[in-house]
Amino acid sequence: YLWYGGGLKKDFSKASEIQKASSINFAKLLEMCALTQPKMRIRFSTSNPQDMSLDVIKIMAKYENICNYIHLPVQSGSNSVLKAMNRQHSREEYLELVKNIFKIIPDCSISHDMISGFPNESELDHKDTLSLMENVKYSFGYMFKYSERPGTPAAKKLEDNIDEKIKSRRLSEIVALQQKHSLFRSKEFIGKTVEVLIEKESKKSSLHWAGRNQQNTTVVFPKEGYSVGDFV
């Protein structure tokens, strides 16, 4: 992606010469934000795998005010399902990207989107999704079972042919595995001191604040004179 003319554009070939000369890529734009707002915590989303470059990852690692958190939708761990979804990445490309993220930002938190029961999804396809999750061990996830959306390519071309009970069972397995991995990632913070940006009063107690750390993990702690917007 290249930024020019006040918006994000994919078709750079149609840009004017002035727009081309003054354009910057997302990595540079992110760096400019980090430099001009050093006291502001910066988090961005969503990062489509095919658009997530090494340059962006390196900029994230370079500046402390850019959060070590990447939402990286995958949808499925099966190449056949990804192809049917018309996704622009393969399982192998996705895992290579994740490998590079952890290499450059070892404590990076990664979240995902996952769909169960896409048309023609087999048990093997489902197991491929579970194995990809085991490989990455995501910190968070947004998980859904497939339902037709009128007008979408999938609704026009593919029959919604997976039984609802199967969809629900597969989704339950995905959710259970994610809960296991979320606990694993949360336990990695035990014994560590992290910086938290206070966002609001805790829902569970008026005596506590709630905020998030660099990895987008929620932290709840006693108020002790702090205020919303403080870094603690």
What positions do the PLM features span?
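Short, small-residue-rich loop/turn micro-motifs
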Residues: 1, 73-78, 145-150, 213-215
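Residues at the N-termini of beta-strands
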Residues: 41, 69, 140-145, 231
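Short beta-alpha junctions and helix-cap segments that line functional grooves
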Residues: 56-57, 129, 221-222
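Hydrophobic, well-ordered secondary-structure elements that form the walls
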Residues: 72, 113, 133, 141, ...
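Thr-Gly-centered strand-to-loop micro-motif
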Residues: 84, 141, 221-222
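C-terminal, non-catalytic macromolecule-binding modules
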Residues: 124, 128-168, 174
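Terminal RNA-binding accessory module
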Residues: 154-232
